[in-house]
A protein has these predicted regions:
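Internal intein/HINT superfamily modules and their associated LAGLIDADG
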Residues: 1-270
């Protein structure tokens, strides 16, 4: 029987990091030494780390910044809002995806750049002729981190879906701006302007109302029923109030927003 290659503690930890965090395959995980696949497997078994199937390894071949949602920032808060409104988390797999209409593809491109996602955005046309774009990636770490902020699988019916109370309050405006870009609108209603955003739970609606109140802006909540699901709409009516909302939402160090909505907002405020 051949003599086993002796590795240092640091080398073993690096192999484990490459395999579990960076999602490298067995060969790539040990390439920095270099050692063979069998040596990598021995180290993984030594520390009781499950060996991935070929399918799992192939899914994780393309890179994504797995730790992105572990560090709060204005941009991170914004992406929580986008994912909370338009994102989907797969129940069984570690897949997260967002589908938007093609005209908003710029937003997906920004997110792809932010999380360093190597998977290209997919453009497609639905059976009804709608042109959409889809971004997706696989990450166990991001799925776990999003759950801490109550962005979970099957969010329409999940009791775990809710307001991200772990988010620093100074990033609330960025989170709400993300929700607005995902499920909100600015429009003329009668002779004045209405700003609105739809959310999936009354808790989120009340919390957003409270946040606006803290910033001297009064908004209302209404209830809509769509396909046996209750939607909670937060809205502000009137040019003066909408001007306050605009000033607050876009007074941020982040440069993330949906350009067409911001431009329409500005045009209606003229």
């Amino acid at each position: 029987m051949g003599r086993q290659i002796a590795l240092t503690k640091e080398q073993e930890e690096k192999i484990i990091y490459n395999y579990t965090i960076l999602h490298y395959g067995q060969k790539k995980a040990g390439a920095f030494i270099p050692v063979s696949d069998s040596v990598v497997r021995r180290i993984l078994k030594k520390y009781n780390i499950p060996i991935k199937s070929i399918q799992e390894t192939n899914i994780n071949k393309l890179w994504v910044k797995h730790d992105y949602f572990q560090n709060q920032s204005p941009d991170m808060g914004y992406w929580l809002g986008i994912l909370g409104s338009d994102g989907s988390v797969n129940t069984k797999e570690n897949q997260i995806y967002i589908e938007l209409q093609r005209q908003d593809k710029e937003l997906l491109e920004k997110l792809n750049t932010t999380i360093e996602n190597e998977r290209p955005i997919k453009d497609y046309e639905t059976g009804k002729g709608y042109k959409n774009s889809k971004l997706y990636f696989y990450s166990k770490q991001i799925k776990q981190d999003l759950a801490k902020y109550h962005i979970v699988p099957n969010k329409t019916y999940s009791k775990d879906y809710g307001f991200p109370e772990l988010l620093n309050p100074k990033y609330y405006k960025d989170y709400i701006r993300g929700l607005f870009d995902g499920d909100g609108s600015i429009k003329m209603t009668g002779n004045s302007i209405t700003w609105q955003v739809d959310v999936g739970t009354i808790d989120i609606a009340y919390e957003i109302q409270r946040i606006f109140k803290t910033n001297q802006i009064d908004v209302e909540i209404s209830f809509l029923h769509k396909k046996n699901v209750t939607i909670y709409r937060i809205y502000g009516y009137g040019k003066k109030k909408c001007q306050k909302i605009y000033n607050w939402l876009y007074n941020t160090s982040s440069s993330l927003w949906l350009e067409r909505k911001k431009k329409k907002f500005e045009e209606l405020l003229k």
